From Swiss-Prot:
The gene is flgI. The lineage of its organism: Bacteria, Pseudomonadati, Pseudomonadota, Betaproteobacteria, Nitrosomonadales. This is Flagellar P-ring protein. The basal body constitutes a major portion of the flagellar organelle and consists of four rings (L,P,S, and M) mounted on a central rod. It comes from Nitrosomonas europaea (strain ATCC 19718 / CIP 103999 / KCTC 2705 / NBRC 14298). Its main location: periplasm. It comes from the Bacteria. Belongs to the FlgI family. Residues 1-24 form the signal peptide. InterPro entries: Flag_FlgI. Keywords: Bacterial flagellum, Periplasm, Signal. The keyword Signal applies.
Length: 370
């Protein structure tokens, strides 16, 4: 494989973060206000109106039980032992995210996912479904027509499907019924929480806030939490938080890190990765096993005998020579890529090479395998 072809193939499997000067970011993009958070909601419901693509009720007894319970609440009582054969109903799980400061009457999006063996939820309508929080209290009620991003068709045993048919969304499909109390800090203090723990970034945020307001306004409690002295009046506190979020801070550069996905062979490096001078020899080892059955029959005039099939295997081991190659020290990400391309290894082989370079101390980066 030529160097140009290797660079092309390596580029398809290795995602690189291009080195750019670090620019200032808003504090809003680096930290969150402690206590201002979303909450997850979940509920169990029924989707009706499907075109024969719903649950097979004989295999999903919980669907039948849910239908009988719903009909009973609506005043429809079926005789005991009634065998329902329905194909236009599906049991689903409904999930939603309740944003911070959401008030009763506001609408939120919901995601509807099939729970049974329904083939498709396309064209279905979700019936009224209460959505509960972790405390088992109802915070929203969902209902509406599903929007499915996939499509499919089947006939005479053949089928075709595009994207996924077992899940969909309802935009503004739930109405908030209960608000979650959110308190902006305790007393005169509120806390900022950095999204990534970093002492340098925390110090820079503190210095920026104190220079904008007054010394003592911000105090770093640790590498993640910054305490702010804020006004007690709600309106003034909101204005204060807004001004804090719009301040620009240059975040600290992260540690050198190489992310390896062992399943796909993908490798991601950040701009801090460097490489010390090292020598690498890499050879491919392949084992080829070829098995052929050989039939052994008795002679034409033998009185007794049986035909026997004996497998005959041939095992061949091939080892390609790997020349020792010098990798010069690299101070930039582009130089690291150029040095790794010079080895000529496949992306899967590159995983082993990076681990060996890290073990030898030549790769100045933290390896993380996902």
């Amino acid at each position: 494989m030529t160097l140009s072809k290797w660079i092309l193939s390596f580029g398809l499997s290795v995602c690189l973060i291009v080195s750019h000067p670090v620019s200032a970011e808003r504090i809003k993009d680096l930290a969150n206000i402690q206590g201002v958070r979303a909450n997850q909601l979940i509920g169990y419901g029924l989707v009706v109106g499907l075109d024969g693509t719903g649950d097979q009720t004989q295999q999903t007894p919980f669907t039948v039980q849910s239908i009988l319970s719903m009909l009973g609440q609506l005043g429809v009582n079926l005789p005991p032992g009634t065998n329902l054969q329905l194909r236009n109903v599906a049991s689903v799980m409904v999930t939603a995210t309740l944003p911070a400061f959401a008030k009763p009457g506001q609408q939120i999006d919901v995601t509807v996912s099939s729970m049974g063996n329904a083939k498709s939820l396309r064209g279905g309508t979700l019936l009224m479904t209460p959505l509960k929080g972790i405390d088992n209290q109802v915070y929203a009620v969902a209902q509406g027509s599903l929007v499915i991003g996939g499509a499919g068709a089947s006939s005479a045993g053949s089928s075709v499907q595009i994207n996924h048919l077992g899940a969909g969304r309802i935009s503004a499909g739930a109405i908030v019924e209960r608000a979650v109390p959110t308190v902006l800090g305790q007393g005169e203090y509120i806390n900022l929480e950095l999204r990534d723990t970093d002492f340098t970034t925390a110090r820079r945020i503190v210095d920026t806030i104190n220079s904008r307001f007054s010394y003592g306004t911000a105090t770093a409690l640790d590498g993640r939490v910054i305490q702010l002295r804020a006004p007690l009046n709600n309106n003034q506190r909101v204005t204060f938080i807004s001004q804090i979020e719009d301040l620009d801070v240059i975040p600290a550069q992260g540690i050198a890190k190489v992310i390896i996905n062992a399943r796909t062979g993908s490798v991601v490096m950040n701009q801090m990765v460097t490489l010390e001078s090292s020598a690498v020899a890499h050879g491919n080892l392949s084992v080829i096993i070829n098995t052929q059955p050989i039939v052994s029959q008795p002679g034409p005039f033998a009185q007794r005998g049986e035909t026997v099939v004996v497998p005959q295997s041939q095992i061949e081991v091939r080892s390609e020579e790997g020349n020792l190659m010098l990798l010069p020290g690299s101070a930039s990400l582009a130089d690291v890529v150029k040095a790794l391309n010079a080895i000529g290894a496949t992306p899967q082989d590159l995983l082993a090479i990076l681990q060996a370079l890290k073990a030898s101390g030549s790769l100045r980066a933290e390896l993380e395998i996902i």
